[in-house]
C-alpha cells in the first residue's frame, strides 16, 4: 500500500506549536491550495484547505520560518483524525516542507 501526498499552497492561519504530554513537539497549520487541472479534457479549478501537522525532533527545524501567508510545498502521508467534537478529517502529516 502507498500513502504519499505532495501539496503546495499558502499557510492560511498562523502555525500553532505545542508539546504532547510525552514531550513530542508538534506544529499544526492549515494549507490552502488553488490550482487548475485538466479533467475530461476540460480545465477545472481546484480548491482545498487541508490541516497539516509536523511532529517530532525535526518539527522545530523545518517549521521555524513558517508564518501565515508563506507559500510552501509539503510532502508526507495522510491519516484520518477524529476531533474532540467527533468530526473526522484527513490530516497531512508532513515530513518535508519547502518554501516556494
Swiss-Prot record:
Keywords, ordered alphabetically: DNA replication, DNA-binding, Primosome
Signal sequence bounds: none
NCBIfam families: PriB_gamma
Gene Ontology biological-process entries: DNA replication, synthesis of primer
Subunit structure: Homodimer. Interacts with PriA and DnaT. Component of the replication restart primosome. Primosome assembly occurs via a 'hand-off' mechanism. PriA binds to replication forks, subsequently PriB then DnaT bind; DnaT then displaces ssDNA to generate the helicase loading substrate.
One function term, GO molecular function aspect: single-stranded DNA binding
Protein name: Replication restart protein PriB
InterPro entries assigned: NA-bd_OB-fold, Primosome_PriB/ssb, Prisomal_replication_PriB
A UniProt-annotated Pfam family: SSB_1
Task performed by this protein: Involved in the restart of stalled replication forks, which reloads the replicative helicase on sites other than the origin of replication; the PriA-PriB pathway is the major replication restart pathway. During primosome assembly it facilitates complex formation between PriA and DnaT on DNA; stabilizes PriA on DNA. Stimulates the DNA unwinding activity of PriA helicase.
SSB domain boundaries: 1-100
Annotated Gene Ontology cellular component terms: primosome complex
Annotated family: Belongs to the PriB family.
Amino acid at each position: 500500500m502507498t500513502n504519499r501526498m505532495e501539496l503546495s499552497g499558502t499557510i492560511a492561519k498562523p502555525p500553532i506549536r505545542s508539546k504532547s504530554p510525552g514531550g513530542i513537539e508538534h506544529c499544526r497549520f492549515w494549507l490552502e491550495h488553488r490550482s487548475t487541472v485538466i479533467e475530461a479534457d476540460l480545465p477545472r479549478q481546484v480548491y482545498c484547505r487541508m490541516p497539516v501537522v509536523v511532529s517530532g525532533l525535526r518539527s522545530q527545524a523545518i517549521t521555524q520560518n513558517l508564518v501565515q501567508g508563506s507559500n510552501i510545498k509539503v510532502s508526507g502521508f495522510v491519516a484520518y483524525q477524529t476531533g474532540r467534537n467527533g468530526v473526522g478529517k484527513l490530516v497531512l502529516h508532513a515530513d518535508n516542507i519547502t518554501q516556494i
